[in-house]
Amino acid sequence: LFPRIREITDAFGGRLQVSVEEHPSGALVVLERPDITGRPRILLDGYGVDVLSGYIMSARLAVPHELPDEHIDGMFATRFRLGLDPCAVLALHQASGPALDIPAPFWDRLYAELCLVAAHARELGRRAEARVH
């Protein structure tokens, strides 16, 4: 069952991979743009997935207006930013590499996919806890 990998595409050939991988803490969600040179990628734990899901919805409601950045800390510290010029894009920044840009055409499908992967990640976390006890 794991790793679980799904690919979202847009009408222009853009690609966004969303995967769930086992991790000692339970699970990680990996977002990657294989269509972009350097294949930018972001690793998120459950907290990061929850914040990203909320930020996607907030961005949808905010466009064409600005939205304050969101920051999460911890092992997978990330900054979420809404860019508006020249088009709406979510930029995810981690210290370990280049920003991962997610254009607006991906947002709805990514939100739906994050709902699914969050459930898988919680289950992997539950299994990891059961192994420890």
Question: What function would you assign to each model-found segment?
Answer:
Residues 1-133:
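Positively charged, low-complexity terminal tracts
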